[in-house]
């Protein structure tokens, strides 16, 4: 993780990363590897999860990418102010938007594809969480709160036409409380959790990717 973060700090620029693959590797270096570490800890704590190690490892990387992509979308303008952008140049080029993003609100037109990708990863994150036994509520809630807050943040991003700082799309304290309450009420019931997250993510664009293929591409393990 430290090696990856150091590498990308030296590559940081206002011109964005080369392509989606480069973005995947960046998100893995700063977040996906954390998912792998937590999975190892969860399995050590709950040995019965060992049988699902490969599936959980793949989904854990997707989980981390979903959270990190949400942060990248939320903080795009704050990053731009310090001369950094993590969006892929290929996406910006496809949308016909001038780069770099400073002072260029039309860049928001290219966010939809990244929102869809992030949402797809967060769906994998939910599947990861549902693989944890329902009686392990501490582990489940730890994951669910992060996913719920990320989904609601994506909703704000998708429906904000001209946000210029991460603060503009930050979810409210009331929304945070609702996430915690909703997850506590439904945390033991897979069907209830699926319905809850379907409601929170209604209307969100979604692009699913193969978590196993992504894992094989970016993972260092």
Residue positions per predicted region:
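Catalytic cores of Mg2+-dependent Asp-rich isoprenoid enzymes
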Residues: 1-66, 77-221
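Single, functionally critical "micro-switch" positions that shape active/binding sites
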Residues: 74
């Amino acid at each position: 993780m430290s090696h990856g973060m150091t590498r990308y700090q030296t590559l940081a620029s206002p011109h964005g990363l080369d392509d989606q693959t480069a973005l995947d590797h960046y998100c893995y270096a700063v977040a996906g590897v954390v998912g792998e570490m937590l999975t190892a800890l969860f399995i050590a704590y709950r040995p019965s999860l060992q049988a699902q190690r490969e599936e959980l490892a793949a989904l854990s990387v997707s989980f981390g990418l979903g959270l990190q992509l949400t942060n990248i979308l939320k903080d795009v303008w704050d990053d731009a102010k310090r001369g950094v952008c993590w969006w892929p140049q290929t996406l910006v080029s496809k949308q016909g938007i001038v780069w770099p993003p400073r002072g260029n609100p039309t860049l928001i037109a290219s966010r939809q594809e990244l929102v869809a990708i992030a949402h797809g990863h967060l769906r994998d994150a939910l599947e990861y969480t549902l693989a944890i036994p329902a009686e392990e509520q501490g582990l489940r809630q730890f994951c669910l709160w992060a996913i719920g807050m990320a989904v609601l943040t994506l909703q704000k991003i998708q429906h904000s036409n001209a946000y210029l700082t991460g603060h503009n799309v930050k979810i409210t304290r009331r929304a945070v409380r609702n996430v915690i309450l909703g997850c506590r009420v439904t945390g033991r019931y897979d069907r209830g959790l699926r319905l809850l997250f379907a409601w929170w993510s209604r209307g969100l664009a979604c692009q699913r990717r193969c978590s196993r293929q992504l894992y094989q591409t970016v993972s260092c393990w």
